């Protein structure tokens, strides 16, 4: 890793009240999918995941990999193609169906009996299962434990007031020896209310520090023209590797 990649100077702001009280409903997230407002989706996959894939997988085979708030992340097929078992959770049924369609994967669907109105979509190959439900309802279903968690666009999308509950669920899903890759964003939260929400280093330490070793792998300037409409003039993505203490 290029040492300069972790030396980008990022100003840390205390978590602001405007974001602490911010709430997006599940229906608002569904509407984003219906309206095509999914700027968070990366058609070519996540570059930092590609770069640090060996660190994440650590040469192990047939891993169980969890994708919280998965959307139609193309990386799910990457892992499945490598022989890993992928499980995701997503509130938008449209997003899940688009994943299978765009990846040319046949699938089946069935109701989740423990969660009224929820469904699980499974690839015909059997190694991709996507749960269409509220992530916070997921503990009602026994989906097993995971060796790896890829958290990109998840912690930053969860309402700030729900972060502790979210983290508790994530850590409850980990197996011994897990590796948890977490991508968060830094920008001036006084200028943009989110989502994606600003997650400072102190918050990550507060959420994960008691149970995880926390290592920042890389910081990257990801500012694009579209971010100007947010009222900000910089945005930095930070990638953390969380491992068992």
UniProtKB/Swiss-Prot annotation:
Coiled coil regions in record: none
Keywords on record: Acetylation, Cytoplasm, Methyltransferase, S-adenosyl-L-methionine, Transferase
GO cellular component, one term: cytoplasm
Record-level Gene Ontology MF annotations: thiopurine S-methyltransferase activity
Post-translational modification N6-acetyllysine, affected residues: 58
UniProt key word ATP-binding: no
Its EC number(s): 2.1.1.67
Enzyme class, spelled out: transferase
Catalytic reactions on record: S-adenosyl-L-methionine + a thiopurine = S-adenosyl-L-homocysteine + a thiopurine S-methylether
GO biological process per UniProt: methylation
Highest taxon listed in the record's lineage: Eukaryota
InterPro entries xrefs: SAM-dependent_MTases_sf (IPR029063), Thiopurine_S-MeTrfase (IPR025835), TPMT (IPR008854)
Compartments where located: Cytoplasm
The UniProt record lists the keyword Metal-binding: no
Amino-acid positions noted as binding substrate in the UniProt annotation, renumbered to this chain: 40
UniProt: S-adenosyl-L-methionine binding residues: 29-40, 69, 90, 152
Subunit structure: Monomer.
HAMAP family tied to this protein: Thiopur_methtran
Recorded family membership: Belongs to the class I-like SAM-binding methyltransferase superfamily. TPMT family.
Protein name: Thiopurine S-methyltransferase
